[in-house]
Amino acid sequence: MALKELFDRDWQELESEGVLFSTLEKLVAWGRSNSLWPATFGLACCAIEMMSSTDGRNDLSRFGSEVFRASPRQADVMIVAGRLSKKMAPIMRRVYDQMPDPKWVISMGACASSGGMFNNYAVVQNVDHVVPVDVFVPGCPPRPEALIYAVMQLQKKVRGEAYDARGEQLPMVEAWTR
């Protein structure tokens, strides 16, 4: 079929013949959502459950998160698993800032989401005070299936975002560096 003939035909007629119509933005969002590369930021017992989400039984790679990246420059999803001490908060922020845009954060476990049972001066009570969190995973520790569900929810969120929607920056909180 010549290109001129293709443009002269009605789009509904072409759609019935199996021609796909979409915007480039939707196509890019679909590609990004199905190729999330997580960076591990395991801080406590939740990290063990995060690691078991990639074993043969759970197989997180079925959902596009193939390999955990050791370098933040190669990752676009940070999974914060466990409690975050105030001494570790600036380091986590630095790792987050080194990740290329667009980037997302999953807060895994009760300790990362609310401080958990560690209600004291040395623990950040919510990772959201340091980096913007996109998905919270409840549990102590959450099961690997819960993390896989969180990745699937993040994929839905990524599909609905515009290409440059994640460019905002939170200021570094000086209270964590004291």
Curated annotation (Swiss-Prot):
Q: Which PROSITE patterns match?
A: COMPLEX1_20K
Ligand binding ([4Fe-4S] cluster): 45-46, 111, 140
UniProt KW 4Fe-4S keyword = yes
Q: Which GO terms describe its cellular component?
A: plasma membrane; respiratory chain complex I
Q: Where in the cell is it found?
A: Cell membrane
Q: Name one Pfam family in it.
A: Oxidored_q6
Membrane topology term: Peripheral membrane protein
Could you say which EC number(s) this protein's record lists?
7.1.1.-
Which catalysed reactions does the entry list for this protein?
Answer: a quinone + NADH + 5 H(+)(in) = a quinol + NAD(+) + 4 H(+)(out)
Q: Which GO terms describe its molecular function?
A: 4 iron, 4 sulfur cluster binding; iron ion binding; NADH dehydrogenase (ubiquinone) activity; NADH:ubiquinone reductase (non-electrogenic) activity; quinone binding
**A biological-process GO annotation:** aerobic respiration
SUPFAM superfamilies (UniProt xref): HydA/Nqo6-like (SSF56770)
Indicate yes or no for the key word NAD. yes
| Cofactor binding note | Binds 1 [4Fe-4S] cluster.
Cofactors = [4Fe-4S] cluster
Q: What does the subunit comment say? A: NDH-1 is composed of 15 different subunits. Subunits NuoB, C, D, E, F, and G constitute the peripheral sector of the complex.
The similarity annotation says: Belongs to the complex I 20 kDa subunit family.
Query: Which HAMAP family is this protein grouped with?
Result: NDH1_NuoB (MF_01356)
Primary role: NDH-1 shuttles electrons from NADH, via FMN and iron-sulfur (Fe-S) centers, to quinones in the respiratory chain. The immediate electron acceptor for the enzyme in this species is believed to be a menaquinone. Couples the redox reaction to proton translocation (for every two electrons transferred, four hydrogen ions are translocated across the cytoplasmic membrane), and thus conserves the redox energy in a proton gradient.
Q: What is this protein called?
A: NADH-quinone oxidoreductase subunit B
The organism's taxonomic lineage, starting at the top: Bacteria, Thermotogati, Deinococcota, Deinococci, Deinococcales
Quote the gene name from the UniProt entry.
nuoB
